[in-house]
């Protein structure tokens, strides 16, 4: 092996976690290589996950907005599009993101190697390139940031042309009139919004008793209602017995005895870590049944010189958190210990239509913990900015301690929820008495804005105290 093939650190995977680690390590002066199995950087987040699905959702929401606004939609004329047509919008965003991220590596003189990596001993990896050639690289330390992929159970034929997962759905060429989505987690709910927004008949099969049960119950109920109101058929507490591909579609047989037929099926029930091809045994590691590896507070595995970040270590499995974990693992590699760690209250952003975001505790969690809390609410339909924009569906809810007035949780349902949440998050992150709902009463907001919902909700909540 040539001396040029040895690095201080090799990062496997160029998604958010790998990027954060590589940038932190190169800026600290280390000689870093990053291995990427695809032909361009960005990982699953950029190419199959966060970026394309949100670009699709944006395009669909604009179509809905146009068709529901009488100013634009006159004489009963409306615009229509298909999933395959709006994929072009997603591709343009992916290309921009890829070029941006490629520039990060170029400017920071980080060595990029394209190919599939696997360990061959404790300090060496083999990289199989697209032309079939194999190259060996060694390093003092490694960071595994290989992400995750959609879980594919053995008894589902994903080779059938009408059965998709959340990656392959982005290659959808035909235009379905009816889709079944199996799995009502975040991905399933987001795609249910997209397809229903395009006018596709949508059946959403949920393996649990309510949608997104980790959310505040009121938010979960609101999503269920809006899905129902838009025509999405939700089947709760169902498990598939058999998925049968036909010449022109798919039939799903449920254990409850029901069966349903559609033009295609999107299987969106779980994800698994991308570790099966790494040959972890060669370095003394073993992944669990979900393809994930365990790490300590410094993102260090049981093998001292091997670290891991992102989806491959499990919760919270968010692109934003993975990038932060990458920065923190760079600190751990350089200084022996991570100087910072993920914040306790990580915000959740769910890009359904309407959008959802939350941070902190839910009402059911506070009730179970016997915390004396109060609720402040603001309805978007009463906000001037929402009325102007025609986005008056939604609300903001603040949960706060009755005695200390400390903000305990914030839950937003409606347009721009994932943006609005960060105003409240910033106050929640303040220490001691600085975290108080009274901030929203004592500050001055721009008018008209969606942010004004915080002032309205704060006044509503404080007026409940006695």
UniProtKB/Swiss-Prot annotation:
Organism the protein comes from: Vibrio atlanticus (strain LGP32)
GO CC entries: cytosol
Entry's cofactor comment: Binds 1 FAD per subunit.
Keyword Cytoplasm: yes
Top-level taxonomy: Bacteria, Pseudomonadati, Pseudomonadota, Gammaproteobacteria, Vibrionales
Catalyzed reaction equations: NAD(+) + NADPH = NADH + NADP(+)
Primary gene name: sthA
Cited InterPro entries: Class-I_Pyr_Nuc-Dis_Oxidored, FAD/NAD-bd_sf, FAD/NAD-binding_dom, FAD/NAD-linked_Rdtase_dimer_sf, Pyr_nuc-diS_OxRdtase, Pyr_nucl-diS_OxRdtase_dimer, STH_gammaproteobact
Residues binding FAD: 36-45
Name of the protein in its database record: Soluble pyridine nucleotide transhydrogenase
